[in-house]
């Protein structure tokens, strides 16, 4: 007996590559994917977004009694001053500070992220993270995002079991250890004052005055720096804010107004 299987045949349509569905997919606009063997080259060839010029002045240096950290408070986008009250010295923990230079959002986010990781390290290991460890942690994080448009130039300053520590970290993952740094568009002017007046055996008062004067002179010459000069001291007992002075008041302190003397010359007129 032969069974009739004609009723079991499928009547569903079979789409081939040439059908309209696949033709529509082929017409969909696409974009280039990065070459995994030359990712950095792909980033260089990509069209960059408009990035307004940024500017700031921050500095930090190690001396006999700890680390002195100072910064201005102006935020700018190109020639536009967007704020005069930005907090550019960020408290990571009670014994460690970070500075902001570059993109405000990038610096604030990654400092906040670093503070969380430092706290988790403290809870897991029952001891505070060292300045060396915190700076290395931030550098490793930023290195993973290199070439992705981050703008970060920060200093990590603090006090740990080994004493004072100071590191510079940038958005490419670079990390430098040093005794004094200045970062930002006003740093060339700040370096001039800092290098001229720096001594390791300064008192806290002398160090804070040097930091304040260096930031002020940078704001005097650099249009992207200004606002308020904030100075912090990091010592064995943690960080403490020393001063916060408006640069306008500091101008009259460093350059006091001296009344000009007007000399009147008497001229005898001889009549004809």
Swiss-Prot record:
Its main location: cytoplasm. Its EC number is 3.4.25.1. GO terms for molecular function: endopeptidase activity; threonine-type endopeptidase activity. The keyword Nucleus applies. It catalyses: Cleavage of peptide bonds with very broad specificity. Residues 1-55 form a propeptide. It is found in: Cytoplasm; Nucleus. One of its GO terms (biological process) is proteasome-mediated ubiquitin-dependent protein catabolic process. The active site is at residue 56. InterPro entries: Ntn_hydrolases_N (IPR029055), Pept_T1A_subB (IPR000243), Proteasome_bsu_CS (IPR016050), Proteasome_sua/b (IPR001353), Proteasome_suB-type (IPR023333). One of its GO terms (cellular component) is proteasome core complex, beta-subunit complex. It comes from the Eukaryota. Gene3D superfamilies: Glutamine Phosphoribosylpyrophosphate, subunit 1, domain 1. Signal peptide: none annotated. It holds the Pfam family Proteasome. Keywords: Cytoplasm, Hydrolase, Nucleus, Protease, Proteasome, Threonine protease, Zymogen. The proteasome is a multicatalytic proteinase complex which is characterized by its ability to cleave peptides with Arg, Phe, Tyr, Leu, and Glu adjacent to the leaving group at neutral or slightly basic pH. The proteasome has an ATP-dependent proteolytic activity. Belongs to the peptidase T1B family. The 26S proteasome consists of a 20S proteasome core and two 19S regulatory subunits. The 20S proteasome core is composed of 28 subunits that are arranged in four stacked rings, resulting in a barrel-shaped structure. The two end rings are each formed by seven alpha subunits, and the two central rings are each formed by seven beta subunits. The catalytic chamber with the active sites is on the inside of the barrel. This is Proteasome subunit beta type-5. It comes from Spinacia oleracea. The lineage of its organism: Eukaryota, Viridiplantae, Streptophyta, Embryophyta, Tracheophyta.
């Amino acid at each position: 007996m032969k069974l009739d299987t004609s009723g079991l045949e499928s009547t569903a349509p079979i789409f081939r590559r040439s059908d309209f569905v696949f033709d529509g997919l082929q017409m969909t606009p696409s974009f280039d994917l990065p070459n995994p063997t030359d990712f950095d080259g792909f980033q260089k060839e990509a069209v960059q977004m408009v990035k307004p010029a940024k500017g700031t002045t921050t500095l930090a240096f190690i001396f006999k009694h700890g680390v002195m950290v100072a910064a201005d408070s102006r935020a700018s986008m190109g020639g536009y001053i967007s704020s005069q009250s930005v907090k550019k010295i960020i408290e990571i923990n009670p014994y460690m500070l970070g500075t902001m230079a570059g993109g405000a959002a990038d610096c604030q986010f990654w400092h906040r992220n670093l503070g969380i990781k430092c706290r988790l390290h403290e809870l897991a290991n029952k001891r505070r993270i060292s300045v060396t460890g915190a700076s290395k942690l931030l550098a490793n994080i930023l290195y993973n995002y290199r070439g992705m448009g981050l703008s970060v130039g920060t200093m990590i300053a603090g006090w740990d079991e080994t004493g004072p520590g100071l590191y510079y970290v940038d958005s490419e993952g670079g990390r430098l250890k040093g005794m004094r740094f200045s970062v930002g568009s006003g740093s060339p002017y700040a370096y001039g004052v800092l290098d001229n007046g720096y001594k390791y055996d300064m008192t806290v008062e002398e160090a804070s005055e040097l930091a304040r004067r260096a930031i002020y002179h940078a704001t005097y010459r650099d249009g992207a720096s200004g606002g308020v000069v904030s100075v912090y001291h990091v010592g064995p007992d943690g960080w403490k804010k020393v001063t916060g002075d408006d640069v306008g008041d500091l101008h009259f302190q460093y350059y006091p107004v001296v009344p000009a003397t007007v000399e009147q010359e008497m001229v005898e007129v001889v009549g004809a």
